[in-house]
Amino acid sequence: MTKSFSIYLDLIRFSAAFVVLLWHSRPLYEHNLTISQYGHEAVIIFFVLSGFVIAYVTDTKEKGLKDYAISRAARIYSVAIPAIIITALVDFSGYTLNSSAYPEAYRAWDLAGIRVISSLLFTNELWTLSTQLFSNVPYWSLNYEVWYYVAFAILTFVNGFKRWLIFGVVCLFVGPKIFLLMPVWWL
């Protein structure tokens, strides 16, 4: 991949992420930009490009499961840990200053430990679960992405019948919500 093509892909990913940000901030503004209605499509674009980039990096730079796992963990936790900390701090402060600004769903501080642990383990969205990270609605996408990393690793680094057995077990573990969107990541 050339440097200019890599920059081009980064620009598309950044643009898609920005559209998602606009979509999530729509409730804050009376007049929405037309482009903000394409948040769902932007998520799909982001997932497709992520799958492409991960496949490329795995093919050219990461020489085994260990390299792949270390790279993916570093990438995902460099986003997840700050997101968890910042969300908890902002929500706690915001709720303390003006609790009426927070819908009932975001006030579940009695489940704070469960929300944080499931967010660190990326188990928020398994099967019918939707354990939201306080007010951080977009955090679901990290959960999906992690399980796509796992599935990709299995299909890339495990051979023979064991590959399909482990892949099947992971699909059964994560459930249909995550599994049904998985092909988008591999387009």
Where in the sequence are the language-model features?
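Specific transmembrane alpha-helix
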Residues: 40-62, 141-160, 164-187
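Short alpha-helical catalytic segment bearing the HExxH-like zincin motif
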Residues: 10, 68, 141-143
